Amino acid sequence: MNVKPEEITSIIKKQIESYEHKIQTVDSGTIIQIGDGIARVYGIEDCMEGELLEFPNDVYGMALNLEQDNVGCVLLGPEKGIKEGDVVKRTGRVVEVPVGEALIGRVVNALGQPLDGKGPIKCTQTRAIELEAPGVIERKSVKEPLQTGIKAIDSMVPIGKGQRELIIGDRQIGKTAIAIDTIINQKDKNVKCIYVAIGQKQSTVAHIVNTLTEMGAMDYTIVVSSTASDSAPLQFLSPYSGCSMAEYFMLKGEDVLIIYDDLSKHAVAYRTMSLLLRRPPGREAYPGDVFYIHSRLLERAAKLSDKLGGGSITALPIIETLAGDVTAYIPTNVISITDGQIFLESELFYAGQKPAVNAGISVSRVGGNAQIKAMKQVSGTLRLELAQYRELAAFAQFGSDLDNSSKERLEKGKRLVEILKQDQYKPMPVEKQIIILYAAVNNYLSDIKVSDIRTFEREFLEYVDTHYRDLGQKILDKKELTDDIKGELNTAIQEFKKVFLA
């Protein structure tokens, strides 16, 4: 083989000409302490608050404490294999999650990674998990109703698109059930749903996903899950991740319903992180900014102005109380941030009233504007009548003689309470709610035994479906009870009662 020296020199010359003098700098530091999912890193200059840091073994962390000589980080993965003295690199990015249509029907963790074994999620866009909430000018007042399908809520505590309505109560009395029923009720209503499970048992999340799949609700739902076995930082990040996924749809002009289940565990996860980072504890050992972590999350729920596409995020945060104490730190914080609360009472639940909504202290501060006129017409006196019934029922326990009008009120109250009961996973369309509440409020049920009320309701609605098929559609079209519709309703009730009481 004959190699010419000129060829070699020309190759060397080309290499020298194409050589570019470039210095690559990487801002890095070393771990000086690690444990309990917290790392202290020395030597990272100019680090941002909330910045992603790259640890060995493809694990990332988030910078939270920027101190004079070191940075306190929380790890977003296992700390196994990471030791003191390891090198940590800055990324210059904040925590982001994938967003887009590809997430619908999937179960993901707080970082948007799939948990359901259905393969990778092909999303082309990402979005920062912490973003500023829309300003005053970018918003519109709440005017459109968001139907939950639950009679007690849609009639007395109505929810509008863009509202934040708190669901609060003790453990195991149906808080999640209300949220899941609301998701099921959004079928064919063009509302995307996001269910964020924070610190729940894995079996509970699996059960919820199975229920939603059976009901066909996973076709428009994303489940973001950080279970009890996940680290505190992942539990802390999951609601913000879910909210960023929701904002993607809101900015496209769509309506989104997001459920945070529950923010009590979210606050506990944040308290854990803060105490491990040596931040000073405040009331109930929560850090001083625990109000801000919830307010900045819930303020991102909004009804956008027409200029921005008119999309909305409706948030239903859930808070767990201890022995019905709504005056504790986290419950009072979240009550003051939200636009009303649905209070569930264990006494009502154990007395067989499900959903156990306490009509006296449950309120919706803005939802009344969103309620359709027909529902306002039937539910106007409902809350007052129930309050009077509770008062009378407490008084009647002493066995004193009551006058006839009080007895009538008691009997009507019993029937109203019975009518507001509802089975789980059976949300009711608003027109059917109006029809049955109209019968209850206008004393048509006074001659029916309390024990037969649920049977009457079921059979009467079937009768209306068969013999007055267009009645429900008329109510939806007109959105109010005109004299014609009232006449038709009265006739239908009287006809059916003859058959029912025969």
UniProtKB/Swiss-Prot annotation:
Subcellular location per the Swiss-Prot or TrEMBL entry = Cell membrane
Under Enzyme Commission nomenclature, its number is 7.1.2.2
Site described as Required for activity, located at: 362
Query: Does Lipid biosynthesis appear among the keywords?
Result: no
Protein residues bound to ATP? 169-176
The protein's annotated catalytic reaction(s) are: ATP + H2O + 4 H(+)(in) = ADP + phosphate + 5 H(+)(out)
A GO cellular component annotation here is: plasma membrane
GO MF annotation: an example: ADP binding
| Top EC category | translocase
Q: Known Gene3D superfamilies for this protein?
A: 2.40.30.20, ATP synthase alpha/beta chain, C-terminal domain, P-loop containing nucleotide triphosphate hydrolases
Entry-linked SUPFAM superfamilies: C-terminal domain of alpha and beta subunits of F1 ATP synthase, N-terminal domain of alpha and beta subunits of F1 ATP synthase, P-loop containing nucleoside triphosphate hydrolases
- How is it placed in the membrane, per its record? Peripheral membrane protein
Alphabetically sorted, this entry's keywords are: ATP synthesis, ATP-binding, Cell membrane, CF(1), Hydrogen ion transport, Ion transport, Membrane, Nucleotide-binding, Translocase, Transport
> Chief location of this protein?
membrane
Quaternary structure and partners: F-type ATPases have 2 components, CF(1) - the catalytic core - and CF(0) - the membrane proton channel. CF(1) has five subunits: alpha(3), beta(3), gamma(1), delta(1), epsilon(1). CF(0) has three main subunits: a(1), b(2) and c(9-12). The alpha and beta chains form an alternating ring which encloses part of the gamma chain. CF(1) is attached to CF(0) by a central stalk formed by the gamma and epsilon chains, while a peripheral stalk is formed by the delta and b chains.
Concerning its family, UniProt says:
Belongs to the ATPase alpha/beta chains family.
Enumerate the NCBIfam families for this protein.
atpA, PRK13343.1
Q: What does this protein do?
A: Produces ATP from ADP in the presence of a proton gradient across the membrane. The alpha chain is a regulatory subunit.
Protein name, as recorded = ATP synthase subunit alpha
Organism, by scientific name, is Clostridium novyi (strain NT)
